[in-house]
Amino acid sequence: IARLKRLGKIRTSETYTAALRSFSGFMNDKEVLFDQLNADLIAEYEAYLKGRGNSPNTVSFYMRILKAVYNRAVEDGLTEQRHPFKSVYTGVEKTLKRAISLNDLKHIKGLDLSLKPNLDFARDMFLFCFYTRGMSFIDMAYLRKKDLQNGILSYRRRKTGQQLFIKWERCMQEIVDKYPINETEYLLPIITKRDEDYRKQYTNELHRVNHLLKKIGKQLDLPILLTMYVGRHSWASIAKSRNVPISVISEGMGHDSENTTQIYLASLDTSVVDKANKKILDLL
């Protein structure tokens, strides 16, 4: 975990910390040697996670992290490879639908929230995510003003390290123009205070925005809970429905990992992706 932090992989270090806490809770905070990790213990841990109501993907998530730590210990010569994870599930199941329709998006965009500035802000962040090909909230939070130059928004995905380029459209500028100029180096009003921890500001805003989006979703009687992540899925789903090539969007994010779609998007000629994005934005 300390190594991940040194490498700047803060989010990954946080997920490893969460997994460590989970396994420590299972072991009642007793220390466990790598040599003690065997198939029976791992099977018991899997049953423990399921017994606490975790979904198959959450159970698999913790197992994959624990397996990665174990394999690292094997590589470093700290233990022998005994394959303790051979009998537990470490794949990813397709989750429930996380996308909304084009009509739903139009309803969100057309909602009169002029007297509800907090909901209006959450709606703007959701739309900005959609406008920018499903940009994740953490990447939105850390967009710098200097990332926007000559009509092109360029940024590096914090999760994958992929460099992405997006043609700046009028709808994006309209959202930026609604809010006072940020006193920090960042473009959007998510991280706004120089004297407060930036990471904490991001996580607080993510929770607040998702809470507000759920209210908007209930107001419109949407079929699923509205969150920032729905914006990511919806762009890909709508793109697919409008015959944008699968090579551009990689199966509407119905893949085994979130990374795949962004890798596809980043590896293509950006003009192809920009045209695809413009095609989708023109529908609204």
Could you tell me what each predicted segment is?
Residues 142-178:
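Conserved tyrosine-mediated DNA breakage-rejoining catalytic core shared by Y-recombinases
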Residues 146-154, 222-224, 244-263:
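Short, polar N-cap/turn motifs at the start of nucleic acid-interacting alpha helices
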Residues 2-11, 20-96, 111-114:
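N-terminal core-binding DNA-recognition domain of tyrosine recombinases/integrases
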Residues 105, 169-223:
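Active-site/catalytic core of tyrosine-dependent DNA strand-transfer enzymes
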Residues 99, 157-161, 253-278:
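Catalytic-site neighborhood detector that most strongly recognizes the C-terminal catalytic loop/helix
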Residues 110, 114-117, 210-251:
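Short, basic (Lys/Arg/His-rich) helix/loop patches that form interaction surfaces
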Residues 83-137:
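Basic, Lys/Arg- and aromatic-enriched nucleic-acid-binding interface segment
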Residues 165-170, 174, 178-179, 266-284:
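DNA/chromatin major-groove-contacting recognition/catalytic segments
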